[in-house]
């Protein structure tokens, strides 16, 4: 019986006639992976969706990969164990890479608590294709917000292995963008992040 490595060695990558560069040129902007990381309740998904709306208004091809949404389908078979969290990030990075190759700006919003796994996700992209956005917020504020009631359930022991309560969150060592949402509104956060993303994707007002 062949090993997985032997099977993989016999698989050849099939190049496409339409390249990523051609898609970027057609779209009028560069494709990028924007990876939002932070505690539950910090505002990752809310900010990512607000940024998506602003980019979409400008005619930019954009899509949000939300961690919770992915667990309804692609990652529905995964638990919250450390090994499954790693696989969750791996799958999301691979899907995101396909979307970037297709010419999209991808906004991934996942807790992704382990620095090593975030760096592994980054390694799947070209050096200038991946931007890490650390959505910083104190645990106290996240727990106060608790929009999904998860912290309350975790404190009661109803949710094991919950990041910030039972498992640590490793802060990014050198994020491309750091935004503290403890005392900032979503709108204020978007105003800080959006210009940076527009510059990174080389989009210019009035060219669409």
From Swiss-Prot:
The keyword ATP-binding applies. Keywords: ATP-binding, Kinase, Nucleotide-binding, Phosphoprotein, Transferase. Pfam families: APS_kinase (PF01583). ATP binds at residues 38-45. Pathway: Sulfur metabolism; hydrogen sulfide biosynthesis; sulfite from sulfate: step 2/3. Gene3D superfamilies: P-loop containing nucleotide triphosphate hydrolases. It comes from the Bacteria. It catalyses: adenosine 5'-phosphosulfate + ATP = 3'-phosphoadenylyl sulfate + ADP + H(+). The active site is at residue 112. Its EC number is 2.7.1.25. The keyword Metal-binding does not apply. One of its GO terms (biological process) is hydrogen sulfide biosynthetic process. GO terms for molecular function: adenylylsulfate kinase activity; ATP binding. It is an enzyme of class 2 (transferase). Belongs to the APS kinase family. Catalyzes the synthesis of activated sulfate. This is Probable adenylyl-sulfate kinase.
């Amino acid at each position: 019986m062949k090993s997985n490595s032997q099977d993989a060695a016999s698989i050849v990558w099939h190049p496409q006639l339409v390249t990523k560069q051609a898609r970027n040129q057609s779209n009028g902007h560069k494709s990028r992976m924007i990876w939002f990381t932070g505690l539950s309740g910090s505002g990752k998904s809310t900010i990512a969706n607000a940024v998506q709306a602003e980019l979409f208004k400008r005619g930019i091809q954009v899509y949000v990969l939300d961690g919770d949404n992915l667990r309804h389908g692609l990652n529905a078979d995964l638990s919250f164990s450390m090994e499954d969290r790693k696989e969750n990030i791996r799958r999301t990075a691979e899907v995101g890479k396909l979307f970037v190759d297709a010419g999209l700006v991808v906004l991934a919003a996942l807790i992704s608590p382990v620095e090593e796994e975030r760096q592994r996700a980054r390694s799947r992209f070209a050096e200038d294709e991946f931007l890490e956005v650390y959505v910083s917020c104190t645990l106290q504020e996240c727990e106060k917000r608790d929009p999904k009631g998860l912290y309350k359930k975790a404190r009661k022991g109803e949710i094991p292995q919950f990041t910030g309560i039972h498992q640590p969150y490793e802060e990014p060592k050198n994020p491309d963008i750091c935004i503290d949402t403890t005392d900032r509104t979503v709108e204020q956060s978007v105003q800080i992040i959006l210009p940076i993303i527009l510059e990174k994707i080389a989009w210019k007002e009035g060219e669409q």
